[in-house]
Every structure is written in structure tokens, then in C-alpha cells.
Swiss-Prot record:
Role noted for this protein: Component of the small ribosomal subunit. The ribosome is a large ribonucleoprotein complex responsible for the synthesis of proteins in the cell. Part of the small subunit (SSU) processome, first precursor of the small eukaryotic ribosomal subunit. During the assembly of the SSU processome in the nucleolus, many ribosome biogenesis factors, an RNA chaperone and ribosomal proteins associate with the nascent pre-rRNA and work in concert to generate RNA folding, modifications, rearrangements and cleavage as well as targeted degradation of pre-ribosomal RNA by the RNA exosome.
Annotated Gene3D superfamilies: Nucleic acid-binding proteins (2.40.50.140)
Source organism per UniProt: Homo sapiens (Human)
Name of the molecule in the record: Small ribosomal subunit protein eS28
Keywords of the record: Acetylation, Cytoplasm, Diamond-Blackfan anemia, Endoplasmic reticulum, Nucleus, Phosphoprotein, Ribonucleoprotein, Ribosomal protein
Chief place where the protein resides: cytoplasm
Disease: Diamond-Blackfan anemia 15, with mandibulofacial dysostosis: A form of Diamond-Blackfan anemia, a congenital non-regenerative hypoplastic anemia that usually presents early in infancy. Diamond-Blackfan anemia is characterized by a moderate to severe macrocytic anemia, erythroblastopenia, and an increased risk of malignancy. 30 to 40% of Diamond-Blackfan anemia patients present with short stature and congenital anomalies, the most frequent being craniofacial (Pierre-Robin syndrome and cleft palate), thumb and urogenital anomalies.
Location of the protein in the cell: Cytoplasm, Cytosol; Cytoplasm; Rough endoplasmic reticulum; Nucleus, Nucleolus
Subunit structure: Component of the 40S small ribosomal subunit. Part of the small subunit (SSU) processome, composed of more than 70 proteins and the RNA chaperone small nucleolar RNA (snoRNA) U3.
Modified residues (Phosphoserine): S41
Amino acid sequence: MDTSRVQPIKLARVTKVLGRTGSQGQCTQVRVEFMDDTSRSIIRNVKGPVREGDVLTLLESEREARRLR
């Protein structure tokens, strides 16, 4: 692992559950708002149970999921 450009771990709160995704519906697409910068929100895919108000630990905060169709 290249430790020269390691991003800090970010905390994000789930603001809206958008729907299920994946070939068998195993992931949930959610909109998250960063705890340190509340004006910034992105869409992520989450594996496992999740609901609005949950706090996620994002190891990689720049990647955004594609929207559901």
C-alpha cells in the first residue's frame, strides 16, 4: 500500500436512502453528508443494513457512485 498519499478517514451521515442496487439487490444506494463539511454531499453504495441518520466511516471519500436508473 502506498502510504505517501493516504487520505484521512471521513465520517458521513446518511441523509436519504435512494434504493437498492447490485445484481441481486445486495447494496443500498444512499446520499451522505460529510460531518466536517455539511455543505458537501455525495452518493455511495453501502453493503449491509443502513437507514437514515446512520454514520458511515468512509475510507475513500472522493469516489461517488453512479445514479440508479
